Amino acid sequence: MGKKSEKKVVEETMEVDEQPAVEPEAVPEEEPEVEDEDLNVPKKKKMEILDPKSFEQDPSNLTLILYEEDHTIGNSIKHILSRMDEVEFCGYNVPHPLEDKILFRVQTKDGINALEVLVKAFESVEQVFSTIRGKFEAAYEKSIA
């Protein structure tokens, strides 16, 4: 490196070093949390039926996307559905680990609405999770008493 190049690097470094430090009072305070409703931001979809026309023609076959969900709910729902007599097939897939969604497929016996069966499965999972939460909270209260 020549002397001119070295001098230029030193001058650039000095400019950066000579900038005044930020005072703690100058740091802006955190913004208060604002609800989406206040901003008129459209709410994100939680669920989407992939082919609504196909589902209307045959309500025993349902393929949908669950947004903001992962293996926790996917495997729980699949487990409950697989034990139901009305269900012929159920499965889920996480398309990509960085995407926050799962694809879910339910096929029921003829004449049985797959969406209604899926709702029953969600209610069962909700009941299981609330039971687990109740037992956990009781054990926690017992341990700190």
From Swiss-Prot:
Q: Does the keyword Nucleus apply?
A: yes
What are the boundaries of the region Disordered? 1-52
Q: Which SUPFAM superfamilies did the record assign?
A: RBP11-like subunits of RNA polymerase (SSF55257)
The annotated regions of Acidic residues compositional bias extend over 12-39
Primary location recorded for the protein, binned into one broad class: nucleus
Q: Spell out the coiled coil positions from the record.
A: none
Q: What does this protein do?
A: DNA-dependent RNA polymerase catalyzes the transcription of DNA into RNA using the four ribonucleoside triphosphates as substrates. Common core component of RNA polymerases I and III which synthesize ribosomal RNA precursors and small RNAs, such as 5S rRNA and tRNAs, respectively.
Would you tell me the protein name for this molecule? Probable DNA-directed RNA polymerases I and III subunit RPAC2
Q: Which gene encodes it?
A: rpac-19
